[in-house]
Amino acid sequence: MRKFTAIIALMAGLVSCVGVDQNLGGDYIPTDQKYDFHTAEFDLDEIWMKSIDSLTAYSSRRITIGSIRDETFGLFSRGSVVTLVPVLDSVDFGKDPVFQRFKFKAAVDSVSVADENQMNILQNVNVYALTEPLGTKDYFSRAEIKHGDKRITKGVPVANGQDSLTFEFTEDYGKQYLSMTQDDLKDLKTYTKKFPGIYLCTDDPVGNGGRFDMFELDILRLVSQSSGASYIARTDNYAILYFNGEFNGERKDSSLMFYFSPIEMQDLDSLINVKKVPSQYVFNVDRHESDHLVGKADDKILIEGGSGVKPVVPASEIQRLVNAEIVKKGGDPVTTLISKATIEMPFDFPEDYTTMFRYPKVLSPTIKISTDTTVTFAGLTDASASDENQGDINRSLCNYAPDITHHVQQIIRKKADDSKLSNYDIWFLIMWYEKTTTTDAEAEEMANFYQQMAYASYYNQIYGGYGYGSYGYGYGGYGGYGSYYNNYYNYQAMAQYASSSATTTTSSTELDKDRYYRAVLRGPKAEGKKPRLKVTFAIPKGYPEK
């Protein structure tokens, strides 16, 4: 009986409640590290639409030309300055050189449109000679380009949105390059003074619509191999001058190749030997008719690509709202910590869902840093933080909601009358996930091999053991190899596997100045959802009384 009673007592002890002291250890936390947390939301009543007229025009990725017109923003046109520079650091045209032809070629990169029905419209491409080189102060995308008004091409080149851009220069323009001397090649400044380059653009559309055409510009690429080795491959982005000259008393045909817009004079042969690619930067400019839209936003916030209008949130507005709330809660902006801050910019889903491609993929908050010679836009979100919103579009919630936590922390600690407070204004720029593809040459060759094997195997099954064709061409001809090459699906699968290993694609977030964008967000005076600032902040607890 005593054992039974003891067992009951033991079980009761096991299931009994244990008191928990929530304050245990609290006395050991430093008093200056105790905080009260608060959340607040504010309507942003002051948002401006401003043109980003200080974007750099230089691009190392693509040549961009074209024009698009719409009913809201008007005409948005693009043009590109390209300098044609010899691939060698020495030239020899022989005696009495005679011009034959001068050809330009650039592979298609991509296109951008306002209406997908205009992806393949025909556009006339205008090519003019520069009358003077770009100046040292020509940096921004709205720079004035000084060029002639006479075409320098044979006929009128046409872009269709799918093919490479190819044309021939007129003899009057091309033969000028036959006057090139060794002294002209001593540096780029000397060279461009004599051969400043060309300007490419398209005709403006008569009505709404149009297209931006983007073309590649790099002449060399680094190709990696699975073994770890690499080599340099030449692309089809170049110009080539054909001529006839007298060499050692005999007239011969010859040619000179040019590449596009290097930053310095280089001998490409020497770069290939050390497996390096040259730095190339074309000068892409844009023109907008939307500057009349600049001003304080009402019920709509308009966003245009390129250097067109973008939303700007004044730092003074953020400081006024947040600091007033902190003081209201009994805190001091100097000692308050911002745990999280987000700007939400809502939009209405378009009635035609197919037009969502016009909206930026990323609307990134930045600040504008100006000096006497340069203007830089610095991103405010932390790209290395996976849980931080970079400003990606949310099609489900219909908003952009980038995190600006660290920036708001800086803003609230500035004095309200600080003359440099406007330097903390938030400029929203359009970003794009640029993809870079590297090729493994060995895997690509293996993929091509298996593809040919699958091709042959397919026809072997159709034509039997004697291959295909009247003479038994292909693998398995005459029946000798039929048993080994009759499984089309195995070879096709192996080809696809090898092909997947042949290329590696990486993505990086970059400023997008080239593509067309047109977005309408809800403004401060819109009915219903409006732009809002959401903040979570922590105020230090007061010291205990003595």
Q: What annotation goes with each model-predicted range?
A:
Residues 4-7, 11-13, 17-546:
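Secreted, disulfide-rich extracellular signaling modules
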